[in-house]
Regions:
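The feature captures the beta-strand-to-loop junction immediately N-terminal to the Walker
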Residues: 38-40
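Conserved ABC transporter NBD signature motif
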Residues: 61-72, 81
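Conserved ABC ATPase "signature" region
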Residues: 117-135
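Conserved ABC ATPase signature
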Residues: 139-143, 147
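Catalytic Walker B motif of ABC-type/P-loop ATPase nucleotide-binding domains
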Residues: 164-167
């Protein structure tokens, strides 16, 4: 069964006066896929990605359907979406909510109500997997843009999502940090089997 099934999705922003940002988009995204959306600036890539998580969906008029595991996305609880659909934003600073690296790694798990033992295990596992143990106790404000984006990714992956959505995650990074980040995303897809949409 597909993670996402998008059927004839049309969307226009409230201020767009009838101009569609997305028009009759149909797409099936299967488990384990690595899907890259390409297009010019303003072509609707970010708008489409934000449709895949209801708390991030912009205001506007939408027609068509989006299904997650065969269920209309609008009927999937926010908690289930938080646990199963990870989303990394363009700007690393837009997603960080705590002051310490370790707390940022644990924040999503706390929000999901995970017990302490599970939280500690997942935080340690992600710190090791992403190679960020050396800055585990650092203030988030001292991190570079690339480190912050890697922390965002590790924090999302600590929740073990089935799908990882990334909205131009390297747009704020230098070329070396961007390359390293994308290699890490590919590793998540191949080693962990996480579906990636970027």
């Amino acid at each position: 069964m597909a993670h996402f099934e998008i059927q004839d999705l049309t969307f226009s922003y409230a201020a767009a006066k009838g101009r569609h940002s997305l028009e009759k988009v149909s797409l099936s995204i299967e488990q384990g896929e690595f899907l890259v959306l390409c297009g010019a600036s303003g072509s609707g890539k970010s708008t489409l990605l934000r449709q895949l998580k209801t708390v991030l969906t912009p205001g506007g008029k939408r027609q068509g359907e989006i299904f997650f595991h065969g269920v209309p996305l609008s009927q999937v609880s926010d908690r289930d979406q938080a646990a199963k659909i990870g989303f990394v934003m363009q700007n690393p600073d837009d997603q960080i909510v705590t002051d310490k690296v370790w707390h940022e790694l644990a924040f999503g798990l706390e929000s999901l109500g995970c017990d302490q033992k599970t939280m500690r295990a997942r935080v340690a596992e992600m710190a090791c997997y992403f190679g960020i143990q050396d800055w585990f106790h650092r203030d988030v404000a001292t991190l570079s843009g690339g480190q912050k984006q890697l922390l965002n990714l590790a924090s999302i992956m600590a929740m073990q999502p089935e799908v990882l959505i990334l909205d131009e995650p390297t747009s704020q990074l230098d070329p070396i940090a961007a390359s390293d980040f994308l290699n890490t995303v590919r590793k998540i897809n191949t080693e962990l089997g996480t579906t990636v949409i970027i």
